[in-house]
Amino acid sequence: MNKRIVVTGTDTGVGKTVFSAGLAGLLGANYWKPVQAGLEQEIDSECIRRLGGLSSDRIVPELYRLRTPASPHHSAEIDGVRIDTETLGLPDSGERRLVIEGAGGLMVPLTARTLYIDIFERWQLPVVLCARTGLGTINHSLLSIEALRKRQIRILGIAFIGERNAETESAVCEIGRVRWLGRLPWLVPLTNDRLQAAFKDSFVSSDFLNL
């Protein structure tokens, strides 16, 4: 039985990491971000530990930790690092489920020749697409859905993040023919307790278990 889920987004800054923290907490899953670009501030795995309540042994180490906060291919070039995409194999998470977070959107380049979506196509894992609820998200979401379908990557569903926008959410799901998984509101302040409570109110765990 597959126990791995990929979390990707329509863009950078849509809330993938916060969603991943909530999902890992809800499922009792491990977390892995294959490539981390930017090390000066709180990195994504640290954010996951704080917001998801994960112990350090539930964080799978990154394969690449790049200093510069930029697209991985550019960050690697600046740091003098060569990303070998052949090493991006799936780790063993034991009996636990595994939440895998990409970087930015689907077309983010890892190298000059390899995009994140190329890796997702190779893995053939179910994908949760995170999207904004604001203006422009219909276009971004439908383009992302089309790209995933073209590669025959299974879309588990779409998770919206932001203020409620029923018309937009409905349009994306109906036109894109994808399942609405729920909507996570922006939380201020954003804490572990508030995120876990909001996640349980916004999503149904069984939607992420039958993979």
UniProtKB/Swiss-Prot annotation:
Cofactor: Mg(2+)
Entry binding sites for ATP: G13, V14, G15, K16, T17, V18, E101, G102, A103, G104, P185, W186, L187, N192
GO cellular component: cytosol
Reactions catalysed, as given in the entry: (7R,8S)-7,8-diammoniononanoate + CO2 + ATP = (4R,5S)-dethiobiotin + ADP + phosphate + 3 H(+)
The enzyme's E.C. designation: 6.3.3.3
Subcellular location: Cytoplasm
GO molecular function: ATP binding; dethiobiotin synthase activity; magnesium ion binding
Assigned keywords, A-Z: ATP-binding, Biotin biosynthesis, Cytoplasm, Ligase, Magnesium, Metal-binding, Nucleotide-binding
Free-text function comment from the UniProt entry: Catalyzes a mechanistically unusual reaction, the ATP-dependent insertion of CO2 between the N7 and N8 nitrogen atoms of 7,8-diaminopelargonic acid (DAPA, also called 7,8-diammoniononanoate) to form a ureido ring.
HAMAP family per UniProt: BioD
Protein's name according to its UniProt entry: ATP-dependent dethiobiotin synthetase BioD
Origin species: Bradyrhizobium diazoefficiens (strain JCM 10833 / BCRC 13528 / IAM 13628 / NBRC 14792 / USDA 110)
